[in-house]
Every structure is written in structure tokens, then in C-alpha cells.
Amino acid sequence: GVPINVKCTGSPQCLKPCKDAGMRFGKCINGKCHCTPK
């Protein structure tokens, strides 16, 4: 995944930030969102 500068405690929190970044969905890894490119 592509790390973005968004803090998280759970993967659902990364859905919108990843979408806003033009990517698909994300996982929360080490407290930061990692997104999947389209």
C-alpha cells in the first residue's frame, strides 16, 4: 500500500482519506493509513 499522512486506530477510518487521495481502500498500519492505488 501507499502510506498517506493520516493517523488511524482502525482500518475503517482509512476508507474516506484513501478515497479522497484518489485511491481505493486502505488499512491502518502502525497508526497510519496505507492506501491501495487504483
Swiss-Prot record:
Task: Provide the GO MF annotations for this entry.
Answer: ion channel inhibitor activity; potassium channel regulator activity; toxin activity
Q: What are the subcellular locations of this protein?
A: Secreted
Question: Which Gene3D superfamilies does this UniProt record tie to the protein?
Answer: Knottin, scorpion toxin-like
Record has Disulfide bond as a keyword? yes
Q: Which GO terms describe its cellular component?
A: extracellular region
**Which cysteines form disulfides?**
C8-C28, C14-C33, C18-C35
Note the InterPro entries from the entry: Scorpion_toxin-like_sf, Scorpion_toxinS_K_inh
**What's in the keyword line of the UniProt record?**
Disulfide bond, Ion channel impairing toxin, Neurotoxin, Potassium channel impairing toxin, Secreted, Toxin, Voltage-gated potassium channel impairing toxin
Tissue pattern of expression reads:
Expressed by the venom gland.
Any Pfam family matching the protein: Toxin_2
Query: Primary place of residence?
Result: secreted
Swiss-Prot/TrEMBL domain comment? Has the structural arrangement of an alpha-helix connected to antiparallel beta-sheets by disulfide bonds (CS-alpha/beta).
Report the family membership.
Belongs to the short scorpion toxin superfamily. Potassium channel inhibitor family. Alpha-KTx 03 subfamily.
Report the function annotation for this chain.
Potent inhibitor of the Shaker potassium channel (Ki=0.16 nM) and its mammalian homologs (Kv1.3/KCNA3 (Ki=1.7 nM), Kv1.1/KCNA1 (Ki=136 nM), Kv1.6/KCNA6 (Ki=149 nM)).
What other note does the entry give for this protein? Negative results: does not block Kv2.1/KCNB1 (Ki >2000 nM).
From the Swiss-Prot or TrEMBL record, give the protein name.
Potassium channel toxin alpha-KTx 3.4
Q: Which organism is it from?
A: Leiurus hebraeus (Hebrew deathstalker scorpion)
